[in-house]
Amino acid sequence: MKLQRRDALRIMAACMADWWLPRQLFAQRISARKKPERRVIVVTFGGGVRYEDTMAPQGWVNIPHLASELVPQGLVYPVARHEGLTGHFNSTGALVTGTRQNVDAYGSEAPVTATIFEQFRKEHALPPEEAWVIATNKSFGLMGGSKLRAFGDPYSANVLLPKQLLIKTIKSAVSTNSGPGVEDRRALAERMMLALDEGYEGFGWRVFESERTLVPELRASLAKSLLDYFNDPAAPTSGDELTFFMTKEIMNRFAPSLLVVNFWDIDIAHYGAFSLYLDAVRRTDRLVHELWQHVQSLPAYRDRTTLMVVPEMGRDSDVAGNGFANHRSGDESCRRVWLVALGAGVPKGAGTERPIRTMDVAPTVAQILGFKMVECEGRPLPELVF
């Protein structure tokens, strides 16, 4: 009999429970630390989107929540630009450091300048739970910190790659003696691997992890979220939905002051199907809206959180580049993006044609959370109230 996906998920949950969740870990709590009053969440339309497909008037149909619900609540910068290499790791690296990056495109090298996470944690003497990168892109394992001697792993962010954590969990669960027969478990693992193999992650993509690993309490928390994922009647069906699910879990349990969330389903555009690209854009728009709703539902975040939404880069134009499917030509369409800010300190219903750069995000975060950037090309956005 063919195993249905939802039944498979429930079987996996049963296999995982004892392995992932020792009972005593439920009783443990991370000790309370003094937190900054403000919170910042940066969300990227990872993979890159073209201005014409999103923030241009003809693209509003693809971002209905941003265009009609979130932009009126905040401030939009329609003229933003990504400067530097138009690959995923380097473009997001520039976003979190405020400086152009030129490291391995597949994530084997950390940023060469200090990230906002390191500088935030070091200046305020904060624990790792206060800064997170949650990314669908599996090459972002080293995005949480640089290798600078004065910073690095002791001050890095926790980096969570939800798809990879789930894959490891599945592999470990099916290797145990409990649960269904060995052949059934192998077949189930193969089905789950296929279900999770979304986005443009072919040969050459590897996971490079930081030297610092999650403490047991954090691992237990994430395992609980995975079990919820398996048992949810509306179980997520894409990498970005899983990333969103895990982001909510981190917010609920630890209320970190600084979060960078990388949605990346949009990079399916590399397969050349415009309809799949637009579906991913609309899904990202929906998830951003749902994330903002979740912010409003939590006392730790409501009225004290600034949300910034920005594409990590654009994509090629049809004329000067290789079309929506790529982002390596470096043409203007690859660089023209936008930024939407809302929440604490952001004027409502505003907009400015003043050109900005994605590198301006990092020093803006620094101003909001009250720390200094030691090296930065970007400039804080003066329209926001610090």
Question: Which positions does each model-derived feature cover?
Answer:
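Substrate-binding rim/cap in mid-to-C-terminal beta-strand-loop elements of soluble/periplasmic
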Residues: N90-G98, R328-L369
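N-terminal secretory signal peptides and thylakoid transit peptides that target proteins
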Residues: M1-M16
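Active-site-proximal N-terminal segment of extracellular/periplasmic enzymes that hydrolyze or transfer
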Residues: W19-Q73
